[in-house]
Amino acid sequence: RAPAALRGKPAAAPGAVIISSSDAHTFALWYFRYAEGRREDVAILNAGLLQYDWYVENVRHLHPGLAMLLECPTCLEKLLAANLPFRPVYLTDPALLPGRAYSLRPAWPLYQVIGRD
C-alpha cells in the first residue's frame, strides 16, 4: 500500500505531509522518497518516532517548512492543527486520527485529514 502513495497518479497532493503508523509503511515510503528520488515535495513522518528528540531534530532539518512544535512534538492533534492550514496531511492508518476535531477522506492508499467545520 505505502509505495502506491508515491508512484503513478499521486495519492498525496503536492507538498503533503504523510504520517505513517508502522515501520513497514515508513520504510517503503522513505525508500521511494529518498532512494528513488520520487515525490521530493512530500514530508514522511513516523508517528512512533515523534517521541524522540533526535528524530524531531532530523525532521526539522529535512523539512524546515514543516511546523514541528517544540513544546509537544508527539501531540499529533497539535501537529495537525499547525500544518493543515498550509499543507495537506495524510495518514497511512485511520487509527492515528486524534480526537474528534478532524475527519478522514479516503485517498487510497492513504487517508486525508480534513478539519471539521
Functional labels for PLM-detected ranges:
Residues 1-117:
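ER/secretory pathway lumenal C-terminal domains and tails of membrane proteins involved
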